[in-house]
Amino acid sequence: EYLSSFYGCTYEESKQITFKILYGGIPDDIAKSIPFFRKTKEYTNELWSKYNRDNFIETDIYKRKLIKKNYTDMNRSKLLNYLLQAYETECNIKTIIELQRYLYEKKTKLVLYGYDSFTIDYNNSDGVDTLKEIKKILERNGHLTKAKMGKNLGELQSIQDRL
């Protein structure tokens, strides 16, 4: 919503514009007029300098090294993209581990993970508190969630108000 006010468009449209700018490179005029992009461009330049100086960069959570010689066509935008994707993936790995530990002795199971979604096969015998705890796990670190339920993926209905 913050960026949609700068663009003068809807939230959904602003998401598309933002990703296009982030992953395609931040033009100087955008960086000058929108503080978020100014800071992002500064951060990207810092990452790029470190990557070129050290010949690698580490991911934030698991400290995996992206070694320069393994990426022949790397550029600033790609480096930022790779690190953002790595951060999201590594956060989700931690979330999956926490969910699996919580669900270990329950009949409810995590059955599918997609980039920004988790599909849970909920068993009524585990009780609604199980769903509430799953929601808490997913919302750690300030992540927002939407909860839906249905007999299959094509029939999902929101259950936000019940949690």
Regions found by a protein language model. Give the residues of each.
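Catalytic palm subdomain of template-directed nucleic-acid polymerases
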Residues: 118-133
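Conserved catalytic core of nucleic-acid polymerases
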Residues: 1-113, 139-151, 155-163
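Extended Gly/Ser/Thr-rich low-complexity repeat segments
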Residues: 132, 136-140
